[in-house]
Amino acid sequence: MGYKVEARSMEISMEDEDSRKKRKKGLNLPKKMKKILRNLWNVGKEDPRRVIHALKVGVALTLVSLLYLMEPFFEGVGKNALWAVMTVVVVLEFSAGATLRKGLNRGLGTLIAGSLAFFIEWVAIHSGKILGGIFIGTSVFTIGSMITYMRFIPYIKKNYDYGMLVFLLTFNLITVSSYRVDTVIKIAHERLYTIGMGIGICLFMSLLFFPIWSGDDLHKSTITKLQGLSRCIEACVSEYFEEKLKDNETSDSESDDEDLIYNGYNTVLDSKSADEALAMYAKWEPRHTRRCNKFPSQQYIKVGSVLRKFGYTVVALHGCLQTEIQTPRSIRVLFKDPCVRLAGEICKVLSELSESIQNRRHCSSEILSDSLEAALKDLNSTIKSQPKLFLGSNLHSNITNKHLNGHVSYYNETNSNGTVSYHNDNNTNGCVLGETIEENDTVSPLPLNSVVSLSSLRSVKKSAATGEKRRLRKQLSKIAVMKSLEFSEALPFAAFASLLVEMVARLDTVIDEVEELGTIACFKEYDKTVEVRIENRLI
């Protein structure tokens, strides 16, 4: 009896738990629906053209469905209208270039395959039943092998792979089916017509109703990359020299700056595949500009490649902000003004390049102005004015020079703890130069003020330590390394400054490629009077 009561109570508890879970799911359902709707809204908000493309696909499917819905069309086309629907679903892409590429590939592949299959069918009919079958089998093997091998050619694979696939499928279906079915050629003709109708509807919707040009997307992408690099450099320099305060607001602003920097150069570094795809689609697009100039897709790819190389320097500059050993802010402040000025000039050049591409005009002949050269000289003179930070103190430099010349005098002494240490007689602080050896170690004494070479000193130490157990010092920490190397605290800043100078050097290549782009794309010439008018309006 007690067992039944326990079982019943367990069942009741399980039912209560299930009911609680169901209520919890019911309460979470509105939140999930709200999240889904928010995601759908964000997709359209990021690019409103996605909404337009969805509506265009809906209209195209509605138009092609009229072949089924309207009686006159259905009597003329019949059940083959299904191929028109399939064509619209497969061919209609986001951009006009992608739709043209896929539509022409499908249309030409179907047309050529049907024509070749009709010729083979005609030869097979006039060759008899047996010879016709042999001829069809041989043709299928030859054409199938040849087309499959041609698909490995890089140019064909890049531009005509879909057309080759459609050709291979259509050719085999018609050729093999025609051997047993007499009406297959008629069916192929009807399907060819319906496929043509589907392609025509796709091109009509893609080219005439709110067309989306891949060339314009590539053009805008190049502008975005230049602007992103400019903002990224500005954020890196400002973060490197700013005073950090321990507040929640500053931590939030730092995270925003980090996101800005990451997004700035990641957009450039991850753009290769997207740029190549846009350039490939742009080749298929008609000349739709005012002057009907050919779109220089390959030059845009070259500009993107140069910007990626420039972006690697920006990544290294951002890495200077995250190194373990940092230059003290008291030293950074000494070089803040020239570095900020140089970074500002670099950003100014990148902004000018983005504006020239955006307005489709050539750059100013004075884009590398005297102010950029003056900023470089200012940074150089500022660094030269602080030689001790980069070369060490006079004492350290004298010791280093003597080491390089191979003439250093040492003496040994016994400390109170019974260890023997080597000292430099020029070092008043008595810094330990070598390893400490235990008390019972025998060392050949070096006379005071004797001059020996560094190699002889090493040989003496090596012979004295033969067969003996050494006691090594503890591993130096980061702070000890900083203290032992007087000039090391300025080395991280030296890397930062050298990267800024490297950016100036790489600007020449970027400017050359942008100017070449303007020449090929027939950009308008730079008009200084227009710039003066704009500046006056802003003032």
Curated annotation (Swiss-Prot):
Annotated membrane topology: Multi-pass membrane protein
GO cellular component terms listed in the entry, alphabetical order: membrane
InterPro entries to which the protein is assigned, alphabetical: ALMT (IPR020966)
Subcellular locations according to the entry: Membrane
One of the Pfam families matching this protein, by short name: ALMT
Regions crossing the membrane: 57-77, 80-100, 107-127, 130-150, 165-185, 192-212
Domain of life: Eukaryota
Entry coiled-coil feature ranges: none
Keyword annotations of the record: Ion channel, Ion transport, Membrane, Transmembrane, Transmembrane helix, Transport
Single biological process term from Gene Ontology: malate transport
Family: Belongs to the aromatic acid exporter (TC 2.A.85) family.
Main function: Malate transporter.
Descriptive protein name: Aluminum-activated malate transporter 13
Organism: Arabidopsis thaliana
